[in-house]
Amino acid sequence: MAHMVGADDIESLRVELAEIGRSIRSSFRRHTSSFRSSSSIYEVENDGDVNDHDAEYALQWAEIERLPTVKRMRSTLLDDGDESMTEKGRRVVDVTKLGAVERHLMIEKLIKHIENDNLKLLKKIRRRIDRVGMELPTIEVRYESLKVVAECEVVEGKALPTLWNTAKRVLSELVKLTGAKTHEAKINIINDVNGIIKPGRLTLLLGPPSCGKTTLLKALSGNLENNLKCSGEISYNGHRLDEFVPQKTSAYISQYDLHIAEMTVRETVDFSARCQGVGSRTDIMMEVSKREKEKGIIPDTEVDAYMKAISVEGLQRSLQTDYILKILGLDICAEILIGDVMRRGISGGQKKRLTTAEMIVGPTKALFMDEITNGLDSSTAFQIVKSLQQFAHISSATVLVSLLQPAPESYDLFDDIMLMAKGRIVYHGPRGEVLNFFEDCGFRCPERKGVADFLQEVISKKDQAQYWWHEDLPYSFVSVEMLSKKFKDLSIGKKIEDTLSKPYDRSKSHKDALSFSVYSLPNWELFIACISREYLLMKRNYFVYIFKTAQLVMAAFITMTVFIRTRMGIDIIHGNSYMSALFFALIILLVDGFPELSMTAQRLAVFYKQKQLCFYPAWAYAIPATVLKVPLSFFESLVWTCLSYYVIGYTPEASRFFKQFILLFAVHFTSISMFRCLAAIFQTVVASITAGSFGILFTFVFAGFVIPPPSMPAWLKWGFWANPLSYGEIGLSVNEFLAPRWNQMQPNNFTLGRTILQTRGMDYNGYMYWVSLCALLGFTVLFNIIFTLALTFLKSPTSSRAMISQDKLSELQGTEKSTEDSSVRKKTTDSPVKTEEEDKMVLPFKPLTVTFQDLNYFVDMPVEMRDQGYDQKKLQLLSDITGAFRPGILTALMGVSGAGKTTLLDVLAGRKTSGYIEGDIRISGFPKVQETFARVSGYCEQTDIHSPNITVEESVIYSAWLRLAPEIDATTKTKFVKQVLETIELDEIKDSLVGVTGVSGLSTEQRKRLTIAVELVANPSIIFMDEPTTGLDARAAAIVMRAVKNVADTGRTIVCTIHQPSIDIFEAFDELVLLKRGGRMIYTGPLGQHSRHIIEYFESVPEIPKIKDNHNPATWMLDVSSQSVEIELGVDFAKIYHDSALYKRNSELVKQLSQPDSGSSDIQFKRTFAQSWWGQFKSILWKMNLSYWRSPSYNLMRMMHTLVSSLIFGALFWKQGQNLDTQQSMFTVFGAIYGLVLFLGINNCASALQYFETERNVMYRERFAGMYSATAYALGQVVTEIPYIFIQAAEFVIVTYPMIGFYPSAYKVFWSLYSMFCSLLTFNYLAMFLVSITPNFMVAAILQSLFYVGFNLFSGFLIPQTQVPGWWIWLYYLTPTSWTLNGFISSQYGDIHEEINVFGQSTTVARFLKDYFGFHHDLLAVTAVVQIAFPIALASMFAFFVGKLNFQRR
């Protein structure tokens, strides 16, 4: 039940939990007393010494000083007394044995008020170090003539990864191997920059998107991708990057949040702290302690305890973790799982802070931080930047931070500003000089304009003109190149060049400043850390392993009841059945390891991040992943053997039972190792699954069962001996058929067992069992070595080599410079006119009011909270919310993280899929009806979910086609789409592919603007926007808000949640709704001129500090209404609002607006959706076709798989199609078709799961928006598959038919094509069906293997229809593969009446098919109908369940 609760929703409860924890502290009196100050006993002077009269304390400290060095470094004195106790004192504690409660209380005592107490703690530490005359290590980072270049492939037309473009690229790569050259271009990302980042100063990196900020941060921290070429020199304290380990010396904090979803926040940071080690803290602590002892100084107990606790290496739980979580505000969610797209966890803002916490918990002294405050409210962002400022100033750290929208208060905390644009540095110097520099260039920052916003806009072509302040001089655009040159001529720029011209004096560098060792811990400790984490993840994924075991039990039950001993005789015919049962066991255990592919591939992104940051070597990750799978593999193999051995009726000897079990265990563990190895090599889920399918195909076809080794072409027999499954087959066969009960002599003078082995080409002696076992162990070792080597030497799977269109290249290279001036003049002239033009293009809509009264929202109490003592059944997340949103009024919905902003929007928009809603919601006075409300409303979600394989323009067109009223003609729609693209400034990237978040395609801010455009183009009357400016820089945010304001001015109702508004953006809103933690309202009303009303309201509360001049009202408002202020002043802002005259006025307004206007009518539409069903289907089919055409990883890979598989089978079964003389030759041909049908289908199903799940997430958003019906979506998805499936089926027939040598008849060729086409359709539609009934890819991937058990066992090959027990015959007829093989074999051989020798008797081919397999040539028409019925049935179930089930938890 815990997964049903949103992270934002329950964050407030975490705070309450913390408060309750503090209130019941008396129950932990012993722990509490350990940390209370006893000022009556002693006082600490300014220098930290203790008064002379505290003799007892001095004696206790002397005891510690006499301890051995190691023990002394781990021992300290902590207060041991309570204010209520008459006797007080201290006790000696071991800092390595602090419990969770002790660590929590210690941090709570050290840091009550984060901003002030963190500063005090850092000052105390610095004072202690300075007092003994020590210097802290510092790092000065220099970069000279730094240039970063990307090599791109130039293509004609749009640079989109279509199947055709990808095929051409593959061919061009092959051509390059011959020495030929392709058309390439080099694009400068960073262009010849110089600079110095000094220690002890906090530097802000500003610049528009795509200006090179991230690349610069990565280059300076030594984390640049290999596909980028870097020249110039970067040095730390005079040392080049290749002279030390920059990844250990500095920390790069990415803008992307990559974490393991199954771990909690605390576990993630603890693991990071453990792997990063303590750096020089131990040496510093020992030296400080030594010098204090020499000088007779007794330190402050709190500081000593803290410094010693964070100086101990390798602890599983670190006090530093508690400290970092506290200062970043993550302590309230420390025990919550991180979660992912489909699994509830912490909020986006908390995830962003966790990314920062993961790195700063380490000992590094240089931080390069990329957009660390995205998604955070301005108050939290200020607090984090303030902590960084304190860290930089007091610890003399080197900190460079990239921010998108820093509030003025946060901006003022920085010492230096670095402004970038187009890969150049426009300014790098003191913050106080930057405005003077631009004023000298002719530009002035207006009053009440944030300086950071001004800096990002003044370098933009479209915004620069408004800041020109020379009224007597004409304005002309000042380019980035000109600004950069002016800066170099400035005294600050010249000073940088002068400093760089003199080499850094290395003798000044502290010995501990740079890290020269790659890893922080000894190998054994790294191994223990990694194996502990791997064990934790296995426990968290227990459901997967239980599900797999249950599935194995089910498969074993089916197998043993099919091959049950009562039906199995000791003869040559049933010997074939025993052989089938053994082979099936091998296949089951082989395929059981298949989920290891996706589980390994999904974690590789986090692994490569941590490997890049030198957390641990690859072997420390690989060995635990291998070792911990041994008991699982052992258990699953034992379960299978115990269930099946005696029921099937294998030889009843204990030794042979255990030998079969040991061999099956070796096969199972080898398969797990093989799939893990393939995942490490191919890295992505889709590519790994394709490779895994090839792996299964290879092991299956060369195992010696489908085609005996003697029948294989001589040049392919190596495949048999290079195959792990072959050794499993040999070992199991000799173990069973060399048993005494198979020793009956046959007419050929061989025993029955030998005869069976000979027919299968397995005539080996008993020693081959041990050879096979050793071979399997060898394969296991080999696969795990390759797994480790792949992790060690392969790089992170980045997006493929960049492609660029010729037009875009020309633009970047400046071939259009001649038109630049005229273009600029035109754009600057057009800018103010644009709004009027937009106003003319207002599509018809009906203004609507949203009112809500006494709105409450509850969810079921999470299980973990019940475990902590909460006995309530429900958890309240919104409490008595009353308000109204009116047409033409732009409303801001604000509050700290966890206040319930998104929850309120979700409830009003009808997006909640769980929980309980109370209260009254009305639209223009009428009760809200969700079906009609979806038609008139738009919702910009916080997570930007879009189809990755279509362009920006196509995404907007698609939304317009499906959501605009059908009365609007196509020309108007096209014009409106163009206008929306221009308004949101997406017109310049309209041909760019959307891509996958954090991997390829659009940047974060471009993706955010696309989300807004997709909703605006629907022309809704009501628009809800959840953090529309998060992830945007100040200029992009201003563009978006300007567009939103223009839309609101047309009479629409718009509500935006917003986190970090600048003054301009905040004051663009007309009204404000402010929530506090717990979902309670503390203000609703107008903002007023310069936010006058909101300021007056809060300043009227006694003891609230007045707002400072030019202070951001949004930040001030959040600060003065915070929970800490409420506690400090003893007030409840929700109660103050409830008792105010403003509340009474608002209540009256809501009552008034809740009544419909006279003569008005409720919203009604002739149909549920804007478009007819046919219109929906056409639009969906259009998008799906584009998406498929641009998905080479899915479509091209499966076509290649089909081609290669067909070639392998064709070569292996060369000309066997008409070579029929014995039953074995018939089995061989049957095996070829059986193998191809099964494995082409399995590959299609497995590779389709990931693709369909991605599209399903998009579908959830589009369905919520009321864009189309489930049946239209399902049919569009189903129909799009058909041409690609047909191509695969055609490949199969064209390649295999002549190679295997089937009968050359058009009739038989058609049947082959038809059978394979229906089979592949069935497998693909099965993938759709599985995705529609499962919550995530992992469960679907496991569930699919259960279907494969039936598809394999009941296909008619392993056990023919005539031998299937009566209680299972129904499953045979429900198995699609049985009908596929029936259709193929019957059509091919059902009319062949040649003589064939079957088990020593003569019969015809047609009679053998009928008597042994149950295939009737005269029933082919029935077979044809059943074959097409399977895909139709699965497609219908997909359409049904995709409409009925919703696994998105909100």
Swiss-Prot record:
Biased composition (Basic and acidic residues): 817-838
Record keywords: ATP-binding, Auxin signaling pathway, Cell membrane, Detoxification, Membrane, Nucleotide-binding, Repeat, Transmembrane, Transmembrane helix, Transport
Gene Ontology biological process terms from the UniProt entry: 2,4-dichlorophenoxyacetic acid metabolic process; auxin polar transport; auxin-activated signaling pathway; cellular detoxification; cellular response to indolebutyric acid stimulus; coumarin metabolic process; export from cell; intracellular auxin homeostasis
InterPro entries (UniProt xref): AAA+_ATPase, ABC2_TM, ABC_transporter-like_ATP-bd, ABCG_dom, ABCG_PDR_1, ABCG_PDR_2, P-loop_NTPase, PDR_assoc
Effect of disrupting the coding gene: Defects in efflux of the auxin precursor indole-3-butyric acid (IBA) associated with developmental defects such as abnormally long root hairs and increased lateral root production. Strongly reduced coumarin (e.g. highly oxygenated compounds scopoletin, dihydroxyscopoletin, esculetin, fraxin, fraxetin and esculin) exudation in the rhizosphere, especially in iron (Fe) deficient conditions. Hypersensitivity to iron (Fe) deficiency.
Recorded coiled-coil stretches: none
Annotated binding of ATP 1, by residue: G207, P208, P209, S210, C211, G212, K213, T214
UniProt main location, coarse: membrane
Domain ABC transmembrane type-2: 525-737, 1175-1389
Tissue expression pattern: Expressed in roots and, to a lower extent, in seedlings.
Role this protein plays: Together with ABCG36, regulates auxin homeostasis and responses by playing a dual role in coumarin (and derivatives) and in the auxin precursor indole 3-butyric acid (IBA) efflux transport, thus influencing roots and root hairs development. Mediates coumarin exudation in the rhizosphere, especially in iron (Fe) deficient conditions, with a strong specificity for highly oxygenated compounds such as scopoletin and derivatives, dihydroxyscopoletin, esculetin, fraxin, fraxetin and esculin; these molecules improve plant Fe nutrition.
Name of protein: ABC transporter G family member 37
Species of origin: Arabidopsis thaliana
